[in-house]
Amino acid sequence: MFVQNQLKSWIASIRSKTALPLRIELWNGQHVDLSSEAPRVTIRLPTVASARYLLNPSLANLGSAYVEGNIEVKGTAQDMISICNALARNTLKPEGKLARIVRSFTHDKNKDAEAIRYHYDVSNAFYEQFLDPALVYSCAYFEQGDETLAQAQVKKIDHILKKIQLQPGQTLLDIGCGWGALVIRAAQQYGARCVGVTLSENQYALARERVAAAGLAHLIDIRLQDYRDVTGQFDRITSVGMFEHVGLKHLPNYFSIINKLLAPDGMAMNHGITSTDPDNGETPYGGGEFIEKYVFPHGELAHIGNVLKTMQQGGLEVLDVENLRRHYARTCALWTENFEAHAEQIRPLAGERRFRIWHVYLAGCAYAFEQDLISLYQIVCVKAGRRSSTLPWSRNYMYAQDARPAPVLAH
């Protein structure tokens, strides 16, 4: 009776603050609607004990309860995330889960490899269900806004290669190469001699297969290797969706390594997710806690100001910064749509628990980018102190239609 009274009081409090298209189904068969609008989301509490997740509805608590099967939720992922954020926002105190907590973790080669395998080595077939055919698992670039996911991913890669002014025959290092889409494109379109490194065994195996199938083994070397173990120098370096795994304390060293690997007249691009909190705090309402526990162990997001500062500490000069937050919101929304459309195929590949984790994660990311809780920046940089005569004077070259040479045929 005590819990029931608490729940009744909580429902009254929420109703007094906002009208949500939410239905709560109780363990005794009764239900309560939180507005006169037809419910778009239903949360079922199977037991009296499960009411505690609503009484303290941080995203970590609600997400964990859904993943572990302690509550059931019906509705689209986008509606679920929006309503759960509203519950948290109207219940939690600012000094509690509402706060943007800063987390710091110990990073070394073994721990980083373990974290990467946890996230990326689900199965290639799993990722094939919701990514584009090239398996590009990073923010797409919607130049006009009406592109398909596949078109936008190709445009993203081309946008990057134009920004770094890749020239025919140059050497390129891609840190965190995924399934090889960027290095394959660079070799096909520019004849670039590429090295791609990843810590994911599944990515490594499939990327090598794709390189061989494209007839590009003479131009592309895919390695199962930590970026800290790479030697030599490269004309161009790209890092797309990787530096989030580096750790806040290690960013100066990360950029120092890029500086060391970059040729004197080289150019690099870092494309990564950032915190929108000036103090490098994680997403609010317990969202960051859920991501750390279930999705990205030891992931840390830096504010763009901190990224620029640590780049300079690493001996790099920033030439260009572009915010692609809205592009990632759309990318994640399309991934979520694909995920839900292929739910029947994904469940047996991932299992129910992992299916629920990713269902929440993808939609939650779309919401977080849309609400400016996190962001995405592409940063072009060079070794500090380059002579002006060796650098572009404007951004015009990035958008020139003839910026990319004719395709290079494999031989």
Segments the model singles out, each with a brief description of its role:
Residues M1-Q153, H159:
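Feature captures hydrophobic
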Residues P168-G176:
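Conserved class I S-adenosyl-L-methionine
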Residues W179-Y190:
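Conserved SAM-binding loop of SAM-dependent methyltransferases across substrates and taxa
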Residues A207-R208:
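Conserved SAM-binding loop
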Residues R228-I237:
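A short acidic, Gly/Pro-enriched loop at the edge of an enzyme's catalytic core
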Residues P252-P264:
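A short glycine-rich, Lys/Arg-flanked "PGG" loop and its adjoining helix->strand segment in the class I
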Residues D265-I273:
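Conserved beta-strand signature within the Rossmann-like core of class I S-adenosyl-L-methionine
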Residues I273-S389:
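Substrate-binding/catalytic lobe of Class I Rossmann-like enzymes that use SAM or dcSAM, i.e.
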